[in-house]
């Protein structure tokens, strides 16, 4: 256990029997399993850019779902701040992700994503947009704190070829979204990362959903993109079918937006790599090239 975690536990007046690191991503989130008297909880450390307003939004989403019977990592105490980083004790979510998924498991995840979106439907009317976020189809990056212009300028200084490619990809992505009228896409509160590793199952049944760090108002095509359904078509098909069965099918515009929004998602992934390089000076050029290659824009 690190000094930082020990200090946070003191702030929370916790004396656990056991502390185990689950995940600790530099410049990102961290999670530690806390066991006390046979009961489990998870101490979450939020990324350096998290603000009280940002966390309040995420916790409101979690509270809404928990009230509706979903097993999610909702807070079981107030957040505390140590050396500029926010921490919060949250509910432990049991089960394990199904990785790798079988076709049947992919279909199951698609149905569960549809059910989650149905549970969140209408919540945006009360919460509005998450502070600092916007729909993916409205900008290069869904996170408004990312300075795309500065990112591309610095990338160009490091790799002129990749900088030129990034600019071209941004132009082509904007054009593709404009061509289908993406500005008219309806938005709703989404999970924001319903990939297989964030969905827990136990004994063949859904046990819970974790990691709502990217939850915000966005389009359902973006939810499909960031759920990585491009490599799990069974998930997308089951998602469509469950929504249609529940009376909330994807519209023609949403169907038309799936491909260009996926390409916008890939550009956003590249933008995060650029942002990391801008902040640290460490550029993973291979990762940047890989993301740009998936935007549908060929290298210039």
What is each PLM-predicted segment?
Residues 1-20:
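Juxta-kinase regulatory segment immediately upstream of eukaryotic protein kinase catalytic domains
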Residues 21-25:
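Protein kinase glycine-rich loop
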Residues 27-38, 42-43, 75-77, 174-222:
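Active-site acidic catalytic loop and adjacent metal/ATP-binding pocket
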Residues 44-85, 100-115:
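A conserved alpha-helical element in kinase catalytic cores
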Residues 88-96:
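Short pocket-lining segment of the protein kinase catalytic domain that shapes the ATP-binding cleft
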Residues 100-164, 187:
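A cross-family kinase active-site recognition segment
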Residues 142, 149-155, 164, 269-300:
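ATP/Mg2+ or Mg2+-diphosphate-binding catalytic cores
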Residues 220-248, 263-281, 290, 294:
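Active-site activation/catalytic loop segments of kinase-like enzymes and analogous catalytic loops
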